[in-house]
Regions:
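Beta-strand-rich extracellular modules
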Residues: 2-6, 98-100
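Extracellular fibronectin type III
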Residues: 4-23
Length: 254
């Protein structure tokens, strides 16, 4: 900025340069979710709070450094640890996250899992893990239309475990580097979407993947030759009735 007045350039004033940073709320780069703080569970945060739990423990040891807009004109920058936000008014808010946020994580059954209402946008995050990402998120629906970057993801263990309302079209996901699909749709009681485009050739574990789901889509295109664990793969999946006679299960031991 060059100082200036009615007589021309100001003399003896300091020139200051700055840049304007646009809000990331409407950015296609942001990871966006919608929550309802009033959906309480045992050991959840208060009815006017929401907590982001970070997957920093062994064995993933992920590093975070992100900015979060909480949807109430409040935000935090350079977040590196678990964080809880308190809203003035309990209710529904859309949270936008940008920066180094390698994994969304629901540590166990009794946190803020029930507060998540929807996945709205994946953004351009480089995801590193999907383990327990939406575990026990029983009220969550899928509204995202973009595709997550899963090129560095090896574990999708329990990603939609007991996500009762989830029925998203995720057939275009690149899961070619995933090795662990244990419990991916375990008791996801609405899920019945095509998955025939998935490349599962590196997967070694599929225990309980479709346990108690209404899934009934063709899987003849799957290369399961590296899978060694299939225990309860279709257990209690009562409507599943698709041919699997071309599957190579020679490496399955469990």
């Amino acid at each position: 900025v060059v100082p200036y007045n009615d007589d021309g350039p100001a003399v003896g004033c300091q020139e200051i340069s700055f840049k304007t940073v646009a809000s990331w709320v409407n950015s296609p780069d942001a990871f966006k979710i919608t929550i309802d703080t009033r959906n309480l569970n045992t050991s959840s945060s208060a009815s006017n709070q929401f907590r982001l739990n970070l997957n920093k423990g062994f064995p993933d040891n992920l590093i975070y450094d992100f900015s979060v807009d909480w949807g109430d004109n409040q935000y935090n920058n350079n977040v590196t640890n678990d964080i809880t936000h308190t809203y003035l008014i309990p209710g529904i808010y859309t949270i936008s996250i940008i920066g180094n946020y390698p994994a969304h994580y629901n540590a166990d059954t009794y946190r803020d899992n029930f507060k998540l209402l929807s996945i709205d946008q994946w953004g351009t995050q480089q995801w590193r893990s999907m383990k327990n990402a939406f575990y026990y998120c029983e009220n969550m629906v899928y509204n995202a239309t973009d595709i997550p970057n899963l090129s560095q993801v090896t574990s999708m263990q329990n990603i939609f475990h007991r996500a009762f309302k989830f029925n998203g079209n995720i057939n275009n996901w690149d899961v070619s580097n995933v090795t662990d699909m244990t419990g991916v749709f375990f008791q996801a009681s609405l899920f019945n979407q095509p998955l025939d485009n998935w490349n599962v050739s590196k997967v070694t574990e599929m225990d309980g993947m479709f346990y108690a789901t209404p899934f009934n889509q063709p899987l003849t295109s799957w290369d399961v030759s590296n899978v060694n664990k299939m225990q309860d793969l279709f257990n209690n999946a009562r409507v599943f009735n698709q041919p699997l006679n071309n599957w190579n299960v020679s490496n399955v031991t469990d």
